[in-house]
Amino acid sequence: MLGLNFKGSWRQYQKQVLDRFQDYQADGHVHLVAAPGSGKTTIGIELIARFGNPALILVPTVTIREQWVDRIQTAFLEDGQRLSDLVSQNLKEMKALTIVTYQAFHSAMNQLQSQEDGEAEDFMGFDLLASLRAQKVATLCLDECHHLRNEWWKSLEAFRKQYGPLKLISLTATPPYDSEPELWERYIRMCGEIDQEITVPELVKEDTLCPHQDFAYICSPTSEEAERLRQFEDSKWQYVNQLLTDTDFQKLITNSKVLRGNITSDVLLEDPKYLSAILIYLHSQKLEIPRNLQELLGTKEVPQLNYAWLETLLQGLLYQTPDWYDDVNDFSKKLEADLKARGLVEKRQVSLVKSKVNDQILNQSLGKLSGIADIFLIEYDSLGQELRQLVLADYIRKDFASYLGDSQASISQLGVLPYFETLRRSAQEHGISVSLAVLSGSVVILPASVKEELVALLPQIHLTFSAVGRLNQADYVQVGFPSTAKGIVAAVTELFQRGRIQVLVGTKSLLGEGWDAPCVNSLILGSFIGSFMLSNQMRGRAIRVWQGHPDKTSNIWHLVALEPIRILPLSGEKEEQDLNTNQDLQTLSRRMEHFLGLAYDYDTIETGLDRLAFPKPPFKKSQIRAYNERIKALSKDRASLREKWQSSLIVADKLEIVNEVAASKNKIPFLVLVDALKWVRFSLILFALDVLYILFRLRLYKVWWLTLACLLFLSFTVLRYVFFKSPYVRLRLLGESIRKAMLDSGHLSDEHSRVQVDEEKERYALFTYLKGGSMRDKELFAQTIGEFFAPVDNQRYLLKAEKAPAGQSAYFAVPTLFEKRKEDAQKFLDYLTPNIGQYRLVYTRNEAGRKILLESRIKSLSNKNDRILTKKKVKSALK
């Protein structure tokens, strides 16, 4: 026994995990998925105690390592027990519980020197396996193990292989559900199947997390940035239109080996989009397309030239297929230089549709400074002295320190110190008395009024206080401390908890992981770099309950910069393109795909940007202003936020998270209906024969049975027609066929799962999802349905209709799970045939198949803006 006894009381969801410990550990693995704030570390320590063996605990960072140590001391050790007797943070001095980072473990496994957060250790000549065996370590606990560098992961796999049997505990807030199958299998081989998942809605229901809401505040670029964006678009448009009429460019294309017949069909069809781009260009310039290439294209309709197709043409000309062109005058070198000079080429990639220049302007837009100031004023107006706001940034920007306090100094970068100065100016301008502070690993700035309290909290550390920039030393001071000092973060956090600091600005690296301040009731994510794991952890800082404050609610603010730019169409285009989807917006969209929260317009809990009622492109300034005004009003109504969570959580005693996939009604295969119509026609013929028979014989009593049979048959077929006419029914049958195919192929783990379809009339959409089964099952099913309905791109296998009804696609894609072998693809089709009718399997990697692929891609160009909408949603597990 390890002598660990939990001193608190377990919450219901924690108790459920521990009550099922015997079941979970039967295979030697306990794998728990738990949202930030769920007490995952505490459960992990209890599981280690129940195994009762010396344990090695691996964690991502030094901060989280110290959090584990602190939790053991405060929650599990009795008076008289010494932490140092039980716990070590050094692999060379192991104890019953040894807690180290993955980086230190990797260095020890490979006998390297380790340098991490100021801690240095030389593992040259150190035998890790022998040391662990000497300590009789029999339990391994992995905290967030899938977010590792590849070399660390390899060290972990090598250790498992060499060390022998171990009891394994895996804890994570963010399992890689959406990863490639190979990565998922690698993860499961290491950690075992997931035993239980604790979600954010469950934690809100249990009062472990507070009611909260996400807000996406749309920031407008500065006038200078907006002008740069406009100039870039105008310059691009002028250059592109000049290029299209350039005789040298036209000569280079029209004299290509492709048009002279010197490139074989096999080569042309290896990647058909470059051939398509040439033909589309010829069509746009009203030039003749060779008959053999038109036949190879497989379609009479050629789409309009747009930026996307011109980008493909230039990419092929310069980088992908330059051998197709005889460039005797080196025109392509001049073309490449011109494109680079205009920011339209980077790292051998032509970018006309998406621009890295524009992305960078918007991502780092100084308009976000105004956004942060606006949000601060909104929240202060709502909460006053109760405001506890955390602002997180990617960088400190130490070089700006000398400008702090100078209200006339221009701010040219985003970061901790620019955010602090922006908030200081805003508070000063509006006459607001608020305590601001900066907390990072190397820069700490505090209100002068808290100096004595900080000294009292850190009596063992020699602190110095000095002026910074032009800030009045009576208002703010910079804190100096030895680089080896411990406890600075904890002390400043305590001042924040007490309300002596109301707005804390810091770096995501310091405050994003492991740091805990339950008082935070407003979070501004001014960070634009980082994975979902990090943004999830940052968000987790704001949604914890605050003891003694049962009415706490929290607002999480995301910043996104948008500038409605009129994209000038290319010559000959019929409609204007919308290219407003920038990297900043895509980052926000990816974040929201993973965060379960309240929908603005419905009493539902789901993921996705749509739940925030975010405007749809093309964006207009009036639309953006109206949206920002709406979320300002929503953010102030915290009482309604709590009520809405309560009404949304009355789903059932037991919650289930499902992955919904939206399907357009006109894309659901309709061939079952054709089959029904065939029977309707047949029954009508029989009925007509019956009538003719009656007319000729005029002996009705002798043919009553035929009349009755015809009427019954007609009724049956009409009902069948009406039944299958429903897209709701057709989608459910299609989903069930796909579920059976996945089950038969071993891709689903639970044979008792079932397919359900919901119709959301307000959104004019049908959503299908898998009910029951593991979260991985749900994720895979949603992915497979989404791939089936996705526009044709470059899939390995397609399904092609023998004859498709008007308005229905003649092509569907075989999903990734079934495309590796022909047998798998055929099995997929066999399961679908009863519900979609006569489709045949097309292999797209030979000449005949590539022609069909090209044809299907050309025909699906009208659907180029189709997006497969997926989201997670809370449902009743009993429904």
Question: For the regions a protein language model found, what residue spans apply to each?
Answer:
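Conserved C-terminal RecA-like helicase domain
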Residues: A35-S38, Q81-I99, F126, K136, ...
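Conserved RecA-like P-loop NTPase helicase motor core
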Residues: H106, A409, R425-G431, V438-T607
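Post-DEXD/H (motif II) to motif III coupling segment of the RecA-like Helicase ATP-binding lobe
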Residues: R149-L209
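Conserved helix-turn-beta segment of the N-terminal RecA-like "Helicase ATP-binding" lobe
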Residues: T63-L91, I188-C191
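Conserved Walker A/P-loop ATP-binding site and its immediately adjacent core
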Residues: T42-E46, R50-F76, Q103-A104, W152, ...
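Walker A/P-loop
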Residues: A26-L47
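Conserved pre-motif I regulatory segment
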Residues: M1-L32
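SF2 helicase catalytic motif II
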Residues: A104-F105, S114-S170
